[in-house]
């Protein structure tokens, strides 16, 4: 199907606008399952307007030396690849301690390797735990008076960051390099509380939008990007299209560590945000 543009068109017409695509490395050795098919698949998605998320399973000693290469390949295809979601391997079945230690890799391990393999363009300090986005959800929820999907998962479940390509240097510039994320999140949380306590939500949101520029260092902001305007559109329009404008300019890097019987954490399971619904109507954490 990767080499069949008609198949891609049928998938798109059926309503699919984004594909999660397994992509474990940039060589045939690390990614034997679809190394040769990937360029054709991306070309088919490009022609049909379907966006792609690369999903590499990361295994220590197997492909952990190619994390930077995966990000660079995504960079070359940013018109269609909008995210890379790394998944440190889940070790299933019977496995001795030595074998586990050979293959086990954690979220912090991956983040450290990414810093090394991107020559410091994406550092360990550029990442945030997933629930950090809750203040943004809270202020949108307060303004719209409608419940929104909350990523209130356990802090150790995963991490993420946004990186942008400087139009002139072609180097990555992480969001944290030119935006005071901590200050912005505190503003969102404070204004959400003001709206909930009865303050006029329209005046409050206008104040939020007005203050956004103060959190952005325009001198360090990548050429061709207006982050404050982009954030304002997301807050005021609250639509998928406004979020899409963000992705066109940037690349999301995510990390989710799936659990196995050797590192199972009940607190993480209880706070999972993604679930399977079984035929007998049980809800099982992803």
Residue ranges and their predicted role:
Residues 29-30, 61, 81-109, 122-144, ...:
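Flexible glycine/acidic-rich beta-alpha junction loops that bind and position SAM and/or redox cofactors
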Residues 53, 83-86, 123, 277, ...:
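A structural signal for short, well-ordered beta-strand segments and their strand-loop junctions
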Residues 58-62, 134-140, 247-253, 259-262:
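Short linear motifs at secondary-structure transitions and domain/linker junctions
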């Amino acid at each position: 199907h990767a080499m069949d543009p008609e198949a891609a068109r049928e998938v798109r017409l059926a309503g699919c606008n984004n594909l999660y695509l397994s992509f474990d490395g940039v060589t045939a050795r690390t990614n034997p399952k679809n190394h040769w098919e990937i360029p054709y698949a991306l070309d088919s998605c490009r022609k049909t307007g379907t966006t792609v998320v690369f999903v590499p399973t990361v295994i220590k000693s197997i492909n952990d030396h190619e994390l930077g290469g995966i990000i660079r390949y995504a960079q070359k295809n940013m018109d269609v690849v909008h995210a890379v979601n790394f998944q440190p391997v889940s070790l299933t079945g019977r496995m001795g301690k030595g074998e586990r230690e050979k293959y086990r890799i954690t979220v912090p391990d991956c983040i450290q390797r990414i810093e090394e393999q991107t020559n410091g363009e994406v550092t360990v300090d550029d990442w945030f735990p997933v629930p950090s986005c809750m203040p943004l959800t809270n202020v949108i929820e307060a303004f719209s008076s409608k419940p929104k999907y909350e990523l209130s998962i356990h802090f150790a479940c995963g991490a993420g960051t946004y990186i942008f390509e400087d139009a002139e240097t072609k180097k990555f510039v992480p969001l944290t390099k030119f935006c005071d994320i901590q200050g912005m999140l505190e503003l969102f949380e404070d204004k959400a509380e003001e709206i909930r306590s009865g303050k006029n939500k329209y005046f409050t949101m206008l104040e939020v939008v007005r203050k956004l520029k103060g959190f952005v260092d325009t001198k360090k902001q990548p050429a061709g990007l207006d982050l404050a305007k982009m954030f304002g559109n997301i807050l005021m329009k609250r639509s998928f299209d406004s979020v899409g404008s963000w992705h066109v300019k940037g690349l999301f890097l995510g990390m989710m560590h799936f659990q196995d019987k050797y590192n199972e954490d009940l607190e993480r399971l209880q706070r999972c945000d993604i679930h399977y619904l079984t035929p007998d109507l049980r809800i099982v954490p992803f």
